[in-house]
Every structure is written in structure tokens, then in C-alpha cells.
Amino acid sequence: WFKFNNDFLIDPNDATCFLSNALIPAMLLGEDIVVSPQYYVSQRFLKHITKIQEVFNFWNPIFKKINITATSKILNNDAAGCGSFFSGGVDGSYTLLKHKKEIEYLILINGFDFNMDTDSWQTMIARTKKTTTLTNKKLITVETNFKEFTSNFGLSRLSNYGGVLASISQLLNLKQCFISAGGTYDTLFASGVHPQLDYLWSTETCQIEHVGLEANRKDKIALIKNEPNVLANLWVCWEDPKVNCGKCSKCIRTFVSLLLCNIEEFPFQQPILMKDVSQIIVKGSEDLLYIEQFFFEAKNQN
């Protein structure tokens, strides 16, 4: 389920967003999907589902190709403006500044990375409102049970989060929606959010785009540095929605990127020391890519 703060006109007979949500769990289970004839889905999206399934199945055969039975329709309803998913982090802030002229809405989600309690959620909303005010954008807040929904099927968030971002874009009927890249062209890996996948979730009226692959962490912060108010409002922490803790791996990685951009003052709750950087534990290929990028950038800067 989804709960929005804005009054968007939603067609109760359009099941496109629910098909997006159900696709990857159904592939994991090997269960076909049948959409009741009283509902319809986007013809463009239905056509692309075969390709989405091919990509997921090629990456991991545990995701079986399934049959979809649904009435399709060429959507022609009026779409809203351009939106971008935003949690206050480096990737979303870079996209906001890079595409400032196009973006009209910033979309903040509770139940995606975290299930925030009321106080934490209100803190996140207040922080994001500072950014929307500074950049003259509108805020869309979304609450969802995505985290529990995905966990119920034993799915990792990485597998299904492209589907849920797509479903929100489709449900809001945004004309264009940006999903921010977490890596670069040379560091791509199999993930539910990927440039080979994201555009395939588009409908006739909603174009979904994967953006930001041209910039690594340091490049992104170098752009954000030019907007001191946006920089001061960054939130990167894995551990606490209310602060940047200064202890988790994301905070420490951000600290290194800030140093590489000659930024020494940043509001971490606990000051980060160079010894903390040396003690980073590499838990996977994504962590290793960040460390390699930092080493390369530091070496270039002597």
C-alpha cells in the first residue's frame, strides 16, 4: 500500500503500479499473474515486461519467467510534472542540482530504506522541506509497507526496489521521474535499479530515467559543494534517520569524499578520525568499489 500527502488524481481501474510491485516476487515464486478484467495496465509497460523478465532471469535464474494475463490500454491521461526520488543523500542531491530546471517535485519515502517512527519521519520531512524551500521545489511524501512486503517473500531490497520506485512514479502519473544512480558507468552491477531496467518500467505518460552515472561520489559532492545550504542539509546515515551518526560505513565513506573535495566541516554527530577510515570493513563488491575510487582519487591528489 501507499499513502501520499498530495492530492493526485488516481484512476482506480489502472492496475499498472500493482503489477510493477508484484512482478519480481511472482518471478521468485514462479507464479503467473492474472489481472482481473475490470482493471487494465499500460500497454507500453506490459510490452516491456518480457524484457524485464529476461534481464532478471539472466542475472539470476531463481527469478523464473512467468505469464502475465491482463487487459492493456494506451494511457493518455494528463501527467503531472517531473519528479525525483530524494532522501537528502549525495545521489539525490546531485540529481536535484544537475536537473534543477526539469525537476518540479522531490519524492520522500518512509518504508523504503527505513520504517521510521512518527518522530523520525517528521524530522525527515522537516529536513527535506528545507531543501525544497531552498530550491523552489514541491515535496511529495510517501508512506509504504514496501519493506515488509519485500521481506515477506524473502527478497532483498536490492531486487525489488526498482519495481516499487516505478510503481510510485506510475501511481503519481508523473510525466518524468528520475532515479538517481548510486554508481558510475564503469561500476554497474546487477540490481533492481539499473539503466538497463529503469526505462522499461515507463508507461505512455510516465517516463522513468536512471540518471547520474557520469559522476562518482567525489564528483557529486564537488557539485553539491557549490550549494552550501544543500550541502549542510545532507543526510547520508544508515543508522539514524535524525542525524549523521559519524560511525556507520556510509558516514565514513561520505567523510572521505568530503575530504577529497577539501570540505572539513560537516555535522557528523560523532567526529570521524582517519583511524576510523582505516578500520572500514569491506562487506561486499559495492564497498570495495568505493574504497578503490577513494584510493584512486587520493593518489591523483597526492
Where are these regions (language model features)?
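Beta-strand-enriched, solvent-exposed domains that form extended recognition/catalytic surfaces
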Residues: W1-D7
